[in-house]
Structure formats: C-alpha cells, structure tokens
Amino acid sequence: MSYKELSTILKVLSDPSRLEILDLLSCGELCACDLLEHFQFSQPTLSHHMKSLVDNELVTTRKNGNKHMYQLNHEFLDYINQNLDIINTSDQGCACKNMKSGEC
C-alpha cells in the first residue's frame, strides 16, 4: 500500500462518526436502520458516511430485501494494520534504509 493510499484511508478514519460506525459493526452485521437508531443525524448523513466506508473498502454491503446490510471488511482492516506496522518498525521495507544519518 502506498503512502498516498494509506493517507486516504486514514482521512476516512479521522471522522469520529465513521470510527463509531466501525465500532458498532465490530459486533457483527447491521442494517442501516440499526445504525441510524444509534446516531442523532439524518439518513442522508448516514448514507454519506457509509458510502465513504464502502468506497474505501473498510465496510462491505449487501441487500437483504429492501435493507442494506453492512459489515466490517476484516481482511482489509488487517491489511491496513500490517501497513501501519511497517511504518512503526525499522525492517527492510522502511524508507529510512536508504538514508545516511548524520551526514548533513
């Protein structure tokens, strides 16, 4: 994952409501109406947040009759965590490996 891609995901995650939606979905699949009951915002606002989460692969969606069901995309969230771990280590993939320190 590139820095630009990771930055885009982190921007999506920087919204407190979206983080709370992910937390609610950590308990399992929920429909939009269940999510909406938890928040004090309108259905269009929820739709905006869900579109962002789905478009960025953090959440998956499926239709169940006339309901939209949402669940966490655990595989992609694990992938994001792996990429954040790379930034937090000094392994071979680290950008600092090509730097010569103390030669300014």
Curated annotation (Swiss-Prot):
Q: Which NCBIfam families does this entry report, sorted A to Z? A: HTH_metalloreg (NF033788)
- The coding gene here is arsR
Q: What does this protein do?
A: Transcriptional repressor for the ars operon. ArsR is a trans-acting regulatory protein which controls its own expression. The repressive effect of ArsR is alleviated by oxyions of +III oxidation state of arsenic, antimony, and bismuth, as well as arsenate (As(V)).
Name of the protein described by the UniProt record = Arsenical resistance operon repressor
PROSITE patterns in alphabetical order: HTH_ARSR_1 (PS00846), HTH_ARSR_2 (PS50987)
Protein species of origin: Staphylococcus xylosus
In alphabetical order, the GO MF annotations are:
DNA binding; DNA-binding transcription factor activity
GO terms in the biological process aspect are: response to arsenic-containing substance
Show the CDD domains listed in the entry. HTH_ARSR
Q: Which residues bind DNA?
A: 32-51
Q: Residues in domain HTH arsR-type? A: 1-92
Q: Which keywords has UniProt assigned to this entry? A: Arsenical resistance, DNA-binding, Plasmid, Repressor, Transcription, Transcription regulation
Ranked from the top, the taxonomy reads: Bacteria, Bacillati, Bacillota, Bacilli, Bacillales
Which stretches are transmembrane? none
UniProt-listed Pfam families: HTH_5
